[in-house]
């Protein structure tokens, strides 16, 4: 994508941004992942990001060598709406704007707590997730996925615009996934529904995004590290 949202500076061409900036579109997510897989699989296409797990139960990755997770992500410019064990669901994302390096002046200070992954550390950059909105063309998509030993998922995506000039838009996205993962005895149940309402006026755009998200993991694995000393 040739443009990205840079905090208080608004939408800018990536060629005019004085930072290392990358914008990943919905097409990128479709190419490198699917709705049942962790977002980190897509993020690692950015050269400053490395994924520390391929597990669909967590969103653990590093940027410039510093551990990060869903805590560090912004949703439509708002920080701290997600948490360590999972970031934004893939199926609600229209675009991800990734800014590497110090940029608190334009994006503010993002969450720095890594939870059980090592405590608080300075955020090495920001990841702003932009959610899907209703476009000019109506959308009606239904997707099924199968992964692990018996994990079955269903996803729905519906959008319409209405009004005399199509000024009102609504988009509804939902998911239900349940079953056994590849790790023996590990189970995951995930269900969510999100709605995006927007109005495009002559001089302004208003957008409201809301949803409900529920994730339950049973007997999931966690990573470990070696201590700094041995006796």
Task: Identify the function of each model-found stretch.
Residues 139-141, 146-230:
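Transmembrane beta-barrel wall of Gram-negative outer-membrane proteins
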Residues 26-27, 48, 66-68, 78, ...:
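Solvent-exposed coil/turn segments that connect beta secondary-structure elements
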Residues 57, 69, 80, 89, ...:
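Mobile, glycine-rich extracellular loop/lid and propeptide segments
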Residues 1-30:
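Short, acidic, small-residue-rich periplasmic hinge/interaction motif at the N-terminus
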Residues 47-57:
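Short, well-structured beta-strand/strand-turn elements
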Residues 23-26, 31, 42, 59-113:
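Periplasmic plug
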Residues 91-143:
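A beta-strand signature from Gram-negative outer-membrane beta-barrel systems
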């Amino acid at each position: 994508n040739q443009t990205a949202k840079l905090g208080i500076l608004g939408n800018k061409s990536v060629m005019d941004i004085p930072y290392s900036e990358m914008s990943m579109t919905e097409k990128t997510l479709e190419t490198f992942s699917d709705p049942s897989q962790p977002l980190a699989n897509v993020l690692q296409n950015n050269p400053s990001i490395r994924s520390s797990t391929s597990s669909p139960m967590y969103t653990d990755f590093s940027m410039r060598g510093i551990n990060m997770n869903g805590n560090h992500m912004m949703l439509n410019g708002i920080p701290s709406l997600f948490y360590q064990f999972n970031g934004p669901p893939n199926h609600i994302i229209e675009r991800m704007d990734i800014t590497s390096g110090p940029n608190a002046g334009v994006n503010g200070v993002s969450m720095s707590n890594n939870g059980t992954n090592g405590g608080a550390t300075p955020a090495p950059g920001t990841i702003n997730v932009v959610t899907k909105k209703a476009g000019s063309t109506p959308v009606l998509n239904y997707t099924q996925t199968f992964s692990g030993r018996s994990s079955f998922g269903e996803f729905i995506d519906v959008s319409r615009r209405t009004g005399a000039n199509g000024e009102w838009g609504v988009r509804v996205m939902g998911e239900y996934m349940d079953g056994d993962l590849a790790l023996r005895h590990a189970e995951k149940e995930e269900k969510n529904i999100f709605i995006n309402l927007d109005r495009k006026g002559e001089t302004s755009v208003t957008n409201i995004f809301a949803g409900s998200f529920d994730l339950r993991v049973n007997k999931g694995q966690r990573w470990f590290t070696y201590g700094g000393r041995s006796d």
